[in-house]
A protein has these predicted regions:
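Internal hydrophobic alpha-helix adjacent to the cofactor/substrate pocket in enzyme cavities
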Residues: 12, 16-20, 69, 184-193, ...
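Dinucleotide-binding/catalytic capping subdomain of oxidoreductase cores
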Residues: 8-135
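FAD-site-proximal beta/loop scaffold in flavoenzymes
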Residues: 121, 126, 138-198
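Eukaryotic short linear interaction motifs
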Residues: 8, 52, 159-161, 200
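Glycine-rich adenosine-cofactor-binding loop
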Residues: 1-15, 195-197
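Short conserved micro-motifs at the rims of enzyme active sites and ligand-binding pockets
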Residues: 54-56, 124, 162-163, 202-205
Length: 211
């Protein structure tokens, strides 16, 4: 649930071959579980259209390297969307359309479902089904998908820290160029970086540079 970079990373890891992950710092028990996985389809839900997708280009493009994996789009005709004035958005739309064309076949599948939101989760002792509503049509148009696993990847919100100012509306620590401010005055020796500085934007590399 959600189509940001966390959702892209989850999909990529779940469909990566164990051999491709051996050189990483992934935990051994996680690697063993992936080796035994019988997962065949991943559905990525986004409540808005493709033009509003939260993932970044690099994370989306990496899905193209997954072997034997088809990629599709449901709920948004990405080929008929108007050209976006935002260069990054247009690049993402073009890349997603290209992935759908070039990776239309595979024994496994990643389906991007746009304008879709979960409304109910069902199962006896474990997840078995998810009811999904079309966010444009409302509950008048619902479907039920069989599912055995669900991840919530719907964003991040900062938490207040005792002794420091906090902007409740934005979920960040107010700052001026990373220097924490209170009542428009800089607090000496107090700095902030990353998502708590500017909100949940950017990938790991951009936050490392911020730090």
């Amino acid at each position: 649930v959600g189509n940001g970079n966390v959702a892209m990373d989850i999909a990529r890891i779940l469909f990566s071959t164990p051999s491709s992950l051996h050189a990483t710092d992934i935990a051994g028990h996680a690697l063993d579980s992936l080796a035994q996985s019988r997962l065949k389809e991943i559905v990525i839900l986004g409540r808005r259209g493709a033009e509003c997708a939260a993932f970044n280009y690099p994370e989306l493009a990496e899905l193209g390297d997954l072997p034997d994996t088809a990629i599709s789009v449901t709920g948004s005709d990405i080929n008929s969307l108007p050209i976006s004035a935002d260069r990054e958005t247009q690049l993402k739309l073009e890349t997603l359309a290209k992935l759908c064309r070039e990776k239309s076949q595979g024994s496994r599948k990643i389906d991007f479902r746009f304008n879709a939101a979960p409304i109910e989760f069902h199962g006896e002792g474990k997840l078995e089904r998810v009811r999904i509503a079309d966010t444009q049509q409302g509950r008048s148009q619902e479907i039920t998908l069989n599912a055995g696993l669900a991840f919530a990847a719907i964003g991040y919100r900062g938490l207040a820290i005792n002794g420091l100012p906090f902007n409740e509306g934005q979920g960040i620590i107010p700052n001026l160029g990373s220097r924490i401010i209170e009542n428009n005055a800089v607090i000496p020796g107090a700095y902030v970086c990353g998502w708590i500085r500017r909100g949940p934007k950017g990938i790991i590399d951009s936050n490392k540079k911020c730090a």
